Amino acid sequence: MSGIHKMSDKKLNILTLAFGIALLPPIWAVLSPYAGITTGAVALICAGLYVANGNKKEDALKITIGFLLGDLWAIIAIWVMETLQFNPNVELYLTLFILGGLAGLIGENIPKYIFTPAWLCGWAIGLTIMGPLSIDSLGTLPIQIGASMIAGVIYVGIGVDAFQKFIIKTIKK
């Protein structure tokens, strides 16, 4: 038996996962700016949530929907806070209270279609990137963020998992 075939399953999983993470996400990081996407790192955050949910391909769509709703929620929050004429802390609290409550109510009532943790995470991502900007200066940022979210779940999350399984299967032949 060669050395690679004697390796424990745990060690093989660790090494192939590390190789997949080292190989695939940097391709997105290098190529995404050529597509006009400046928010490529968002993909890693979104892939992390996908993996934390157990790499369940059957949940990929509802996780993606959750992220995209979070992106939309960030735009709505920015618009609401820009429109209100209260103390900024009151505006922030009320906006987070109402939109957070609505996200929880909506997402948890239709969990077949929406993964609420992804919605909240996507909202936080959107607010972190777009929060300091005015609604008029967002430009294509929401689209870039959404594209990075989709890439995170599909390309990085599902892609690295499939790549790892392929490598392990090939090695074990």
What is each PLM-predicted segment?
Residues S2-N55, G139-P142, G146, V153-K173:
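Alpha-helical transmembrane segments and their membrane-interface boundaries
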Residues A41-I78:
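Alpha-helical membrane segments and adjacent membrane-interface helices in multi-pass membrane proteins
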Residues I21-P33, F67, D71-W79, L96-E108, ...:
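Transmembrane alpha-helical segments of multi-pass membrane transport proteins and ion-pumping complexes
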Residues A22, I37-G54, F97-A103, G107-D136:
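Pore- and pathway-forming membrane helices of multi-pass small-molecule/ion transporters and channels
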Residues A29-A43, M81-F97:
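Structural signature of hydrophobic alpha-helical transmembrane segments
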Residues L31-Y34, K56-K57, M81-N87, I106-Y113, ...:
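Membrane-interface helix caps and helix-loop-helix hairpins in membrane proteins
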Residues I75-Q85, T128-P142:
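Hydrophobic alpha-helical transmembrane segments in multi-pass integral membrane proteins
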Residues A60-L69, V90-Y93, Y113-G122:
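Cytoplasmic-side transmembrane-helix entry/capping segments in multi-pass membrane proteins
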